[in-house]
Curated annotation (Swiss-Prot):
Annotated compartments: Endoplasmic reticulum; Golgi apparatus; Basolateral cell membrane
Alphabetical UniProt keywords: Catecholamine metabolism, Cell membrane, Deafness, Endoplasmic reticulum, Golgi apparatus, Hearing, Membrane, Methyltransferase, Neurotransmitter degradation, S-adenosyl-L-methionine, Transferase
KO phenotype (gene knockout): Originally identified in a genetic screen for genes required for hearing and balance. The mercury circler mutant phenotype is characterized by balance defects, an absence of the acoustic startle reflex, failure to inflate the swim bladder, lack of hair cell-dependent calcium responses in the hindbrain, and undetectable microphonic currents. No morphological defects in the sensory hair cell bundles nor epithelium.
Catalytic activity: a catechol + S-adenosyl-L-methionine = a guaiacol + S-adenosyl-L-homocysteine + H(+)
Protein name: Transmembrane O-methyltransferase homolog
Source species of the chain: Danio rerio (Zebrafish)
Any one biological process term the GO annotation gives: auditory behavior
One Pfam match: Methyltransf_3
Function: Catalyzes the O-methylation, and thereby the inactivation, of catecholamine neurotransmitters and catechol hormones. Required for auditory function. Component of the hair cell's mechanotransduction (MET) machinery. Involved in the assembly of the asymmetric tip-link MET complex. Required for transportation of TMC1 and TMC2 proteins into the mechanically sensitive stereocilia of the hair cells. The function in MET is independent of the enzymatic activity.
Highest taxon listed in the record's lineage: Eukaryota
InterPro entries listed in its UniProt record: SAM-dependent_MTases_sf, SAM_O-MeTrfase
GO cellular component: basolateral plasma membrane; endoplasmic reticulum; Golgi apparatus
GO MF term (any one): catechol O-methyltransferase activity
Encoding gene, per UniProt annotation: tomt
């Protein structure tokens, strides 16, 4: 049995750790514990609960209303790891500056980033959005259509990214990708980047934007991008979406080819 004296000796260390990592404890509570309790009580998924909230509070056909309502849900009701409004502005700027025609999104989740991109793309542009989870894909489709974007603008593909990328040219007639948004499993970032390189679908000026490269992090992806000589790399520092105090960032890779 631990004596009171020893316990008291460790108390300052414990308090220091709690204070230092308090935002991570809050994230654990919001993203894991709250979700588990509400899943048990409601009998439906967190993503479906978010859709029901958006359906009740947002204006159909108004993409900004959809995004604002989603942000309110994620910041005040339940945490969902969307790109969020702050990092979303980085994405908005890239879209405005580059006017991509063909976009590949890896990790649709609930469709937040899909809606954010679709509202800013030029006429004739098309998004191929890939989501491997069937339930998430179903929710995303409802949110994307509620925002007013049809199949001509957004094609949702419910398959793993490593199956989709090699067949984009053959199955969908894609010749070049102007922008790729990576926001799926972080361990897939580097393998999928290699698949994109091998496919020949990224060319001079193609942009790969990868979210959450600081937290939870994609160190191998960043290391390769910086060392391979194929990309100009810029990391946009930010905080984790809907959370204070947890550093995060987005990596912007511009393909320049072999130097």
């Amino acid at each position: 049995m631990v004596s009171p004296a020893i316990a008291l000796a460790f108390l300052p260390l414990l308090l220091t750790l709690i204070i230092r990592y308090r935002y991570y404890f809050v994230l654990l509570y919001r993203a894991v514990l709250t979700r588990w309790v509400r899943d048990c009580l409601s009998g439906i998924s967190r993503e479906e609960r978010a859709f029901q909230y958006i359906l009740t509070h947002a204006t159909p056909g108004d993409s900004q209303s959809i995004l604002d309502t989603f942000d309110t849900w994620c910041s005040k009701v339940e945490f969902i790891s969307n790109i969020g409004p702050k990092k979303g502005k980085i994405l908005d700027r890239l879209l405005q500056e580059n006017c991509p025609i063909t976009v590949l999104e890896l990790g649709t989740h609930c469709g937040y980033s899909t809606v954010r991109m679709a509202r800013s793309l030029p006429i004739g542009a098309r998004i191929y959005s890939v989501e491997m989870d069937q339930r998430n894909a179903q929710v995303a489709e409802k949110i994307i259509r509620l925002a007013g974007f049809d199949d001509d603008m957004v094609e949702l593909i419910q398959r793993p990214s490593d199956e989709v990328i090699p067949r984009l040219r053959e199955d969908l007639g894609v010749e070049r990708l102007d922008l790729v948004l990576m926001d799926h499993w972080k361990r897939c970032y580097l393998p999928d980047l290699h698949l994109l390189e091998d496919s020949g679908l990224i060319g001079q000026g193609s942009i790969i934007l990868a979210d959450n490269v600081i937290f939870p992090g994609a160190p191998n992806f960043l290391r390769y991008a910086r060392r391979c000589g194929l990309y100009e790399v810029r990391v946009h520092r930010a905080t984790l979406e809907y959370m204070r105090g947890i550093p995060d960032g987005m990596a912007e890779l511009t393909y320049i080819g072999i130097k």
